Curated annotation (Swiss-Prot):
GO terms for cellular component: chloroplast; small ribosomal subunit. One of the primary rRNA binding proteins, it binds directly to 16S rRNA where it nucleates assembly of the body of the 30S subunit. With S5 and S12 plays an important role in translational accuracy. This is Small ribosomal subunit protein uS4c. Part of the 30S ribosomal subunit. Contacts protein S5. The interaction surface between S4 and S5 is involved in control of translational fidelity. Coiled coil: none annotated. Keywords: Chloroplast, Plastid, Ribonucleoprotein, Ribosomal protein, RNA-binding, rRNA-binding. Belongs to the universal ribosomal protein uS4 family. Residues 17-36 are annotated as: Disordered. It comes from Agrostis stolonifera (Creeping bentgrass). The gene is rps4. GO terms for biological process: ribosomal small subunit biogenesis; translation.
């Protein structure tokens, strides 16, 4: 299944706020159309909805998300928490959380077009996994800096998660550590996502 490129408002009406996909928020009462089913059908619908929220927020294909679930399942810690850590430490998401892009698709474009450096080297892979002490910067030219300047200027410093630091003058971000669960930027029940995939096998 390919990455979603359709109407974004349609998705947030159905799934609720997806800040990684769009800054728009659903009008009160317009999202999460409730269809009541009995027993197993209702439980399946809830698990599917949480999986879709995760997929669309981070801008993943079904295959990519499944691969992350498999990797997380091999860890000795909670599969759900490891899954969220893997997704949050992607380079495209780090750029988004730093405020260097307004959405994850926007951050992905910056990476694909070779505007972003990690520890002084160009990285053009959005799924690149960042680690503690990584330094994220733009290329040292006017065009690259101009692409992130307005986003950084308009971003709310109070929303910056504690595992990241941003130098707004140097257009430089720092990964301080692996994020804690409470800093995830999406309202999600990750256990239901893991449960969804465990029931597919």
């Amino acid at each position: 299944m390919s990455r979603y490129r359709g109407p974004r408002l349609k998705k947030i009406r159905r799934l609720g706020a997806l800040p990684g996909l769009t800054r728009k928020t659903p009008k009160s009462g317009s999202n999460l159309k409730k269809k009541f089913h009995s027993g197993k059908k209702e439980q399946y619908r809830i698990r599917l909805q949480e999986k879709q929220k995760l997929r669309f927020h981070y801008g993943l294909t079904e295959r990519q998300l499944l691969r992350y679930v498999h990797i997380a399942g091999k860890a000795k810690r909670s599969t759900g928490q490891v899954l969220l850590q893997l997704l949050e430490m992607r380079l495209d998401n780090i750029l988004f959380r730093l405020g260097m892009a307004s959405t994850i698709p926007g951050a992905r474009q910056l990476v694909n077009h070779r505007h972003i450096l990690v520890n002084g080297r160009i990285v053009n892979i959005p799924s690149f996994r960042c680690k503690p002490r990584d330094i994220i910067t733009t290329k040292d030219n006017q065009r690259s800096k101009g692409l992130v300047q307005n986003y950084i200027a308009s971003s709310d410093p109070g929303k910056l998660p504690k595992h990241l630091t941003i130098d707004t003058l140097e257009y430089k971000g720092l990964v301080n550590k692996i994020l804690d669960r409470k800093w995830v930027g999406l309202k999600i029940n990750e256990l239901l996502v893991v449960e969804y995939y465990s029931r597919q096998t």
